Amino acid sequence: MATGTVKWFNAEKGFGFIAQDGGGPDVFVHYSAINATGFRSLEENQVVNFDVTHGEGPQAENVSPA
């Protein structure tokens, strides 16, 4: 499982990007990948744990607060 910091997240559009700790490309995150009940959103500079999968680029899955 990787750790990173939310660069930005647009709650209206339901997606954003996470900067990986230790470098590497930014990781796309969709609201459906956030492990939460109710309204799923992330805050800028929030530290999160996530799994990286690959679609058109790196994508986050199983996102949860660190």
From Swiss-Prot:
Assigned keywords, A-Z: Activator, Cytoplasm, DNA-binding, Stress response, Transcription, Transcription regulation
Example of a GO MF term: DNA binding
Superkingdom of origin organism: Bacteria
SMART domains attached to this UniProt entry: CSP (SM00357)
SUPFAM superfamilies per record: Nucleic acid-binding proteins
Expression induction or repression: In response to low temperature.
Subcellular location: Cytoplasm
Domain CSD: 4-63
Principal location listed in the UniProt entry: cytoplasm
CDD domains: CSP_CDS (cd04458)
GO cellular component, as recorded: cytoplasm
InterPro entries found in the cross-reference section: Cold_shock_CspA (IPR012156), Cold_shock_domain (IPR050181), CSD (IPR011129), CSD_CS (IPR019844), CSP_DNA-bd (IPR002059), NA-bd_OB-fold (IPR012340)
PANTHER family linked to this entry: COLD SHOCK DOMAIN CONTAINING PROTEINS (PTHR11544)
Name used for this protein in its record: Cold shock-like protein 7.0
Gene that encodes it: SC7.0
